[in-house]
Swiss-Prot record:
Keywords: Host cytoplasm, Host Golgi apparatus, Virion, Virion tegument
Family assignment from sequence similarity: Belongs to the herpesviridae cytoplasmic envelopment protein 1 family.
Name of the protein in question: Cytoplasmic envelopment protein 1
Broad class of where this protein is predominantly found: virion
Pfam families found in the cross-reference section: Herpes_UL7
UniProt GO cellular component terms: host cell Golgi apparatus; viral tegument
Source organism (scientific name): Equine herpesvirus 1 (strain Ab4p)
Superkingdom of source: Viruses
């Protein structure tokens, strides 16, 4: 296989490594910044859900609260259509304020994975490790909240909603957000990375030309090439993108996720979230302890 072809089907084929960074630092190479910038793309948030909990009742992990979105041309605000409120819109800012005013709103849960661990239909992470990849994020800044909403919507976007118009509007928002990212805003950068991977991958799997081919999750690109839209694909190919880990590999008991706790409609980019292993891990993680990993526990944050 030629290097050119390999690069086309594997966006990470020529990505930097820690060894390259150490070597560059040793030599005083000016490329260190570029290498570091490339390395941060190897960790991405996935499967964003809104978390709500009322005392005495089971928690709720929701991915379906936003059913449509667009950018208003005059105000340039992100407008949302909420589940059950078709025909009316509210701004993302208004929705953020309403969420933050509700004691039941706990924030967003998300998994931090590598692009190669995202195997299309399952996650290539053992349950014993998967629970340590979960983070609870409760953004109070509109930009950060917007990134969470965008990723959650794109991950659960149906073919009908995945239009060129939507993609252009979201890309414009992300381009503007990228200008606000500084080294101090680590969670914003992480969420921007996630939204960028998700946007380009959704474009790829819905037969649109991605804005950045190098930011299409590699397994989704390969799965599209190998599996296409065929309904009778060879079992060995199905296994590549559907073989995960059994819960028996977990060292601690996993509490089954009750019916209705995770609200998720299967879409192009959220198949792993709909699996029993991931749902049970998410529920067990939430109910096992009151202390959840937050941005402060995964990053060294600066004042």
């Amino acid at each position: 296989m030629s290097a050119t072809m390999r690069a086309e089907i594997d966006p990470l084929a020529h990505s930097a490594t820690v060894d390259e960074m150490v070597e560059a630092i040793t030599k005083g190479d000016d490329s260190v910044t570029t290498i570091v910038d490339d390395l941060v793309w190897h960790a991405t948030p996935r499967f964003v859900t809104e978390v709500r909990e009322v005392p005495g009742l089971p928690p709720s992990f929701t991915t379906t609260s936003v059913t449509d979105m667009r950018v208003d041309a005059s105000s340039e605000k992100l407008m949302l259509t909420l589940d059950g409120q078709e025909g009316s819109e509210i701004s993302c800012e208004t929705y953020m304020r309403s969420c933050l005013d509700l004691p039941a709103f706990k924030g967003f849960s998300l998994f931090v994975v590598t692009p190669l661990e995202d195997r299309v239909n399952v996650l290539g992470v053992a349950p014993v490790i998967l629970s340590h990849r979960l983070v609870l994020y409760r953004p109070t800044d509109l930009i950060d909240f917007t990134l969470c909403i965008i990723q959650m919507y794109l991950e659960n976007c149906s073919t009908k909603r995945a239009t060129s118009s939507l993609f252009v509007q979201i890309e414009c928002i992300l381009r503007n957000i990228s200008k606000t990212i500084t080294p101090l805003l680590k969670m914003r950068r992480l969420m921007y990375i996630g939204a960028t991977w998700t946007l380009n991958t959704l474009m790829c799997v819905t037969n649109h030309n991605p804005f950045d081919q190098a930011r299409v999750l590699p397994n989704y690109m390969m799965a599209k090439m190998l599996l296409g839209q065929k309904s009778n694909t060879p079992a060995i190919l199905d296994a590549i993108y559907s073989a995960g880990y059994r819960q028996t590999l977990s060292k601690r008991p996993i509490t089954p996720c009750p019916s209705g706790v995770l609200r998720c409609n299967k879409a192009h980019l959220n198949a792993p979230l709909c699996t029993k292993v991931v749902a049970d891990t998410l529920y067990s993680w939430w109910t096992a302890t009151d202390e959840k990993p937050v941005p402060e526990s995964i990053y060294v944050l600066y004042d």
